[in-house]
UniProtKB/Swiss-Prot annotation:
Upper classification of the organism: Bacteria, Bacillati, Bacillota, Bacilli, Bacillales
Reactions accelerated catalytically: a [peptide](out) + ATP + H2O = a [peptide](in) + ADP + phosphate + H(+)
Record bears the keyword Protein transport: yes
Protein name: Oligopeptide transport ATP-binding protein OppF
Gene Ontology annotations of biological process type: establishment of competence for transformation; peptide transport; protein transport; sporulation resulting in formation of a cellular spore; transmembrane transport
Length: 305
C-alpha cells in the first residue's frame, strides 16, 4: 500500500444558505493508497458524506484538488475522459431503498453502467454479465427480472454493490452502506465487501459512524469534526492510542459487553476550548509519529511527540 491512488489536497465544500455559508468540508487533505480501505468516521453532520460526494464529483468542489491516479477529478474534461473517470470510481449509497429505481428491474439497474460504457456487445452477453454479478454478491440469477420492492434491505444493498461492480471500478466510495440495515445483515454485507476487495483488488473509502464496524474493515481511519479531519492513523493505532480529545470522546461512547464496567464508566465529552489557543495561533494537521496525524497546537504537538 505504497502507491497513491487518490490524493485530496485542501478540499473545501461550502454551501451558501440564507443564514450564511456552511463549511461542510473545510480544508481537508489526505491520501488513499491502492488496495486499502480508509474508514472515515464522525458524528452526523460532520461532513463525511459530503467529502465522499465531493471526491466523486457529485458536488463541484468549492476549492482544493482531488487527484485520481495523478489526474485532477474536478478539472475540465471531455465527455470521453469523464466516462473513463466515472467507470473507475463508483459509489455505494447509504439508503438501499431510495438508491434503486423502483420502476426498473434488477437486471436493468445493474446493467445501466454496462449500457452507458458499452461493455456488453449483445443482449445475451449483457444478461450473462448481470447473472455473474448477482451470483458474485450472493443473489440468484432468477432475481434479475424482479423489482426492488420485492427484496429485503440487505438484498437491495447487495444489488447496489453489484451495480457498482458492473463497470470494474478501481475505487469505491461506500457511504454508510450498512447504517440502514439490521445488525444481523450488517456483518454479511461488510464480509462481502472484504471478499470482493481481495478478489478484485479494490480500494475503498468506507464512510460510517459505527466505530466497531469501521475498525473491522479499515486499514486506516480518519476522524472528522465540523468539516475538518482531526485525526488519521492505522486502525489499531487509533483505537489503542487515540490522541485528539474528540477521538477519545467518540471511543468512550462505544458500549462494552460488561454491565459492571459500564455502570461505573465515565463518558468523555469533547470541549474545543481544551486546546487553549494563544493569540494568533491556529490548529494544524501534524504527523506526530509515522502514519499518525493529529489536528493540534504547537504545544500539543510537542507533548504528543
Amino acid at each position: 500500500m505504497t502507491e497513491k491512488l487518490l490524493e485530496i489536497k485542501h478540499l473545501k465544500q461550502h454551501f451558501v444558505t440564507p443564514r450564511g455559508t456552511v463549511k461542510a468540508v473545510d480544508d481537508l487533505s489526505f491520501d488513499i493508497y491502492k488496495g486499502e480501505t480508509l474508514g472515515l468516521v464522525g458524528e452526523s453532520g460532520c461532513g463525511k458524506s459530503t467529502t465522499g460526494r465531493s471526491i466523486i464529483r457529485l458536488y463541484e468542489a468549492t476549492d482544493g484538488e482531488v487527484l485520481f491516479n495523478g489526474e485532477n477529478v474536478h478539472g475540465r474534461k471531455s465527455r470521453k475522459k469523464l466516462l473513463e473517470f466515472n467507470r473507475k470510481m463508483q459509489m455505494i449509497f447509504q439508503d438501499p431503498y431510495a438508491s434503486l429505481n423502483p420502476r426498473m428491474t434488477v437486471a436493468d439497474i445493474i446493467a445501466e453502467g454496462l449500457d452507458i460504457h458499452k461493455l456488453a456487445k449483445t443482449k445475451k452477453e449483457r444478461m450473462q454479465r448481470v447473472h455473474e454479478l448477482l451470483e458474485t454478491v450472493g443473489l440468484n440469477k432468477e432475481h434479475a427480472n424482479r423489482y426492488p420492492h420485492e427484496f429485503s434491505g440487505g438484498q437491495r444493498q447487495r444489488i447496489g454493490i453489484a451495480r457498482a461492480l458492473a463497470v470494474d471500478p478501481e475505487f469505491i466510495i461506500a457511504d454508510e452502506p450498512i447504517s440502514a440495515l439490521d445488525v444481523s445483515i450488517q456483518a454479511q454485507v461488510v464480509n462481502l465487501m472484504k471478499e470482493l476487495q481481495k478478489e478484485k483488488g479494490l480500494t475503498y473509502l468506507f464512510i460510517a459512524h459505527d466505530l466497531s464496524m469501521v475498525k473491522y474493515i479499515s486499514d486506516r481511519i480518519g476522524v472528522m469534526y465540523f468539516g475538518k479531519l482531526v485525526e488519521l492513523a492505522p486502525a489499531d493505532e487509533l483505537y489503542e492510542n487515540p490522541l485528539h480529545p474528540y477521538t477519545k470522546s467518540l471511543l468512550s461512547a462505544i458500549p462494552l459487553p460488561d454491565p459492571d464496567y459500564e455502570r461505573n464508566r465515565v463518558r468523555q465529552k469533547y470541549d474545543p476550548s481544551v486546546h487553549q489557543l494563544k493569540d494568533g495561533e491556529t490548529m494544524e494537521f501534524r504527523e506526530v509519529k509515522p502514519g499518525h496525524f493529529v489536528m493540534c497546537t504547537e504545544a500539543e504537538f510537542k507533548a504528543f511527540s
